[in-house]
Each structure stands twice: as structure tokens, then as C-alpha cells.
Amino acid sequence: MASRIKKGDQVIVIAGKDKGKQGEIIRIDGHRVVVSNVNIVKRHTKPNPQRSISGGLIDREAPIHVSNIQVLNPMTGKGDRVGFKILDDGCKLRIFRSTGEVIGA
């Protein structure tokens, strides 16, 4: 089954404390995604000399639920719903519902 969102998509947050922020999908974990520069949290980390990690407070992105994001439509500059279009050769493409444009083309 094809996914409505993919790693590298430009998305906009539509709900939550970071509503309106835009970013790129870094990682997908089931129904949660990590978006660059969105949902920044502080983590207390211990120093680990074997991995050359200095301890202290580190800011990093935390995952948010996929229902709180929409794929950013570059033509309109707004978040848009994602649909699928099946070509004659059986290839499945992701499209924007409002404009019908192919995503990532």
C-alpha cells in the first residue's frame, strides 16, 4: 500500500503548539513523523566518551502524529490533502486533491 506521506516531503503543521510551522519529514515511525525544526524538546543526556557525546541539555525534534500535518502544496503555499491516481500501466502516483498536480514531480 502506498503511503500518503514520504520521507523528504515538505509539510505544514495544522494542529498543536507548532501550528503553522513548515519543515521536511526526517523520519516516519508508524503513525508518527519527525519534522525538521518542529516540536523541539530538551533532552537531558549523559556524557558518553566512547561515542564522543558531551552531556547536558540537547534540543532535538520529537515525533508528532500524522493527523497533525499536511503536505505543503508549492503552487498554493498551503497544506493540501493527498490522493492517488493510477495510470494505465498500473503505476500509482500521489496527487494534490485541490490542483490534481503530481507530488514530487
UniProtKB/Swiss-Prot annotation:
GO cellular component labels: ribonucleoprotein complex; ribosome
UniProt keywords, alphabetically: Ribonucleoprotein, Ribosomal protein, RNA-binding, rRNA-binding
Family: Belongs to the universal ribosomal protein uL24 family.
Protein name, UniProt field: Large ribosomal subunit protein uL24
GO BP term (any one): translation
Assembly information from the UniProt record: Part of the 50S ribosomal subunit.
Gene from which the chain derives: rplX
One Gene Ontology molecular-function label: rRNA binding
Summary of the function given for this chain in its UniProt record: One of two assembly initiator proteins, it binds directly to the 5'-end of the 23S rRNA, where it nucleates assembly of the 50S subunit. One of the proteins that surrounds the polypeptide exit tunnel on the outside of the subunit.
Residues passing through the membrane, by range: none
Pfam families from the UniProt entry: KOW, ribosomal_L24
